[in-house]
A protein has these predicted regions:
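N-terminal "domain-start" segment that seeds a small globular fold
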Residues: 1-19, 38, 42, 233, ...
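Short active-site neighborhood of thiol/selenol oxidoreductases, capturing the structured segment around
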Residues: 14-50, 56-58
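Short acidic, S/G/P-rich loop/turn micro-motifs used as interaction or catalytic elements
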Residues: 30-34, 65, 220
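Short, surface-exposed basic-aromatic patches at helix termini and helix-loop junctions that form
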Residues: 48-49, 71-77
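Thiol-based oxidoreductase modules, predominantly thioredoxin-like and allied folds used
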Residues: 52-67, 79-87
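Residues lining hydrophobic/aromatic ligand-binding pockets adjacent to catalytic sites
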Residues: 55, 199-200, 229
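Thiol/selenol-based redox catalytic cores and closely related redox-interacting motifs
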Residues: 85-220
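A short, polar/charged loop-to-alpha-helix boundary motif
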Residues: 219-240
Length: 241
């Protein structure tokens, strides 16, 4: 299957994203969305393997340059791997899920989605962040320190008391809390306009000839991957060891 024309047209405008190489294109939601943070943080962990495998990465988010600068500084995503649009024009052209659109503006829709309405899997994924998951990799190393605002710091060794090699109880919830503190403390930097806070994203892995090796459309909040326990599982067979 050939990649959508709208996607190929956009990639033609981006240096380094021409055909002749495999390309991973990630359409993030609003930069201030938790999904955007988690997806970027997952991608940062495989950047060397993507490069070694000859896969060019391009993330496209909703926001502005100031938000993109801060987003990349916080998540570690290289700034040249992220471009931003002030409106979800490409998202709409690809018919990605716009989220609930009830009367009263975007906030009622977002709150309903956070409650799992029109956002399948959200509540289960929230719960997984607290309960832990033995099928998922650990998120916080023993020597890592997670900053929660200005004063509170949590050391990874705290989770080490519960074991290692899997996602411990409250571990993912702590990562999400750190992301939330960052977003809420700089809301207007990450979200210049509230109009698109329900918009979801998608993923496209393209072959050298522009055919689609893999694609996924986000179905709801905390649903940026079909396998949230290992969000990049779809990439494993394409990455160098």
């Amino acid at each position: 299957m050939q990649a959508p024309a709208a996607l190929l047209s956009r990639l033609a405008e981006i240096p380094g994203m021409a055909p002749g190489q495999r390309r991973l294109v990630v359409l993030l939601s609003q930069l201030g969305d938790f999904d955007s943070f988690e997806y970027a943080q997952a991608l940062v962990g495989v950047l060397p393997r993507l490069e070694a495998s000859g896969i060019a990465l391009q993330a496209i988010g909703i926001g502005d340059d100031a938000g993109a600068d801060r987003f990349c500084a916080f998540t570690g995503l290289p700034r040249n791997r992220l471009i931003v649009d002030d409106e979800p024009i490409l998202h709409r052209a690809l018919d990605l899920y716009g989220g609930l659109q009830p009367p009263g503006g975007p906030w009622p829709g977002l709150l309903l989605m956070c409650a799992g309405i029109g956002s399948p899997g959200t509540l289960a994924e929230v719960l997984r962040g607290y309960s832990g998951d033995r099928t998922a990799a650990e998120r916080i190393g023993a020597d890592q320190v997670v900053q929660l605002g200005r004063w509170l710091r949590i050391r990874g060794s705290l989770f080490g008391r519960l074991g290692s090699g899997y996602q411990r109880p409250f571990e993912l919830a702590t990562v999400r809390l750190s992301n939330m503190v960052e977003v809420l403390g700089h809301w207007r930097t990450y979200v210049p306009r509230d109009d698109y806070i329900t918009q979801r994203g998608g993923t496209y892995l393209l072959e050298v000839d522009d055919s689609v090796l893999y694609s996924y459309r986000d179905r709801g909040i905390l649903g940026f991957s079909a396998t949230m326990d290992r969000p990049l599982r779809f990439l494993e067979s394409f990455l160098a060891a």
